[in-house]
Curated annotation (Swiss-Prot):
It holds the Pfam family Methyltransf_11. It comes from Mycobacterium bovis (strain ATCC BAA-935 / AF2122/97). The keyword Cytoplasm does not apply. Gene3D superfamilies: Vaccinia Virus protein VP39 (3.40.50.150). PANTHER family: 2-METHOXY-6-POLYPRENYL-1,4-BENZOQUINOL METHYLASE, MITOCHONDRIAL, METHYLTRANSFERASE. This is Uncharacterized methyltransferase Mb0229c.
Length: 254
């Protein structure tokens, strides 16, 4: 069975439209948005593990690199997965406020580019929408492979710069260029964007991710995270994938 066979059944147009509808809440109601995304992500990880191990990931340990305040912790705990969140920014760790103070799991303040874990420590290593926020995304990916046990899963998902959501809260102005979009945001709002080009947001292409994954010798699959199964072919078309694959998932095993 291919690693994506189980998840492919879930990757329907209805799911894509539901997730797209919830994106409008990312800035104004992040708890609502991330609960939906967390449930979908936990289901995706469960499907990928089931396809490769013929059993659900119950009792396994997952490391969430760049987990922020732990929005994903409850979803994975509910699935029976042990959760460890890593986040370098103390403000992000507490961004969810009191509603998430009792969240399950373990939380560590550290950089994803220098994970404070021993080699072969976890069963699953996940990074969801983080690679575009660090200056060396493939160093992050290499660290994820290092801490994952042989036969485990590494799932690195990131927003493609030239896709429609590449500019984050800067909107489609990123097509004018990152620096110009950042300056335009400051003029309009009077302060830099949270996801500020050049400091907390970087231009990461689909081609870069595919090249890195292939170079590791550990790649199992690549697919567009939010697209229905019938649109996954887009990842195989150079140039087109940069604009139409909004979020790329790289699945690897050490």
């Amino acid at each position: 069975m291919a690693v994506t066979d189980v998840f492919a059944r879930r990757a329907t147009l209805r799911r894509s439209l539901r997730l797209l509808a919830d994106f409008r809440y990312e800035q104004r109601d992040p708890a609502r948005f991330y609960r939906t995304l967390a449930a979908d992500t936990a289901a995706m990880i469960g499907d990928l593990w089931l396809a490769t191990h013929s059993e659900p990931p119950v009792g396994r340990t997952l490391l969430d690199v760049g987990g922020g305040p732990g929005y994903f912790a409850t979803a994975f705990s509910d699935a029976g997965v042990g959760y460890i969140g890593v986040e370098p920014d103390p403000d992000e760790m507490h961004a969810a406020g009191p509603a998430f103070t009792g969240r399950p799991g373990m939380f560590v303040r550290a950089s994803g580019m220098a994970l404070p874990l021993a080699d072969d420590s976890v069963d699953i290593c996940l990074s969801s929408n983080v690679a575009e926020h660090v200056p060396r995304p493939w160093q992050l990916g290499t660290e994820m492979l290092r801490v994952t046990k042989p036969g485990g899963l590494v799932v690195l998902s990131y927003t493609v710069w030239l896709g429609p959501f590449g500019g984050h809260e800067m909107g489609l102005s990123h097509y004018l260029g990152g620096a110009r979009a950042a300056a335009r945001y400051v003029r309009k709002h009077g302060h830099p964007a949270k996801n500020n080009y050049g400091s907390s947001l970087f231009a990461v292409s689909a081609a870069e991710g595919l090249r890195w994954a292939a170079g590791t010798g550990a790649a199992l699959a690549v697919f567009p995270r939010y697209h229905p199964r019938w649109a996954w072919w887009l990842t195989s078309v150079p140039v087109l994938r940069e604009f139409l694959v909004s979020n790329l998932v790289l699945v690897l095993t050490p």
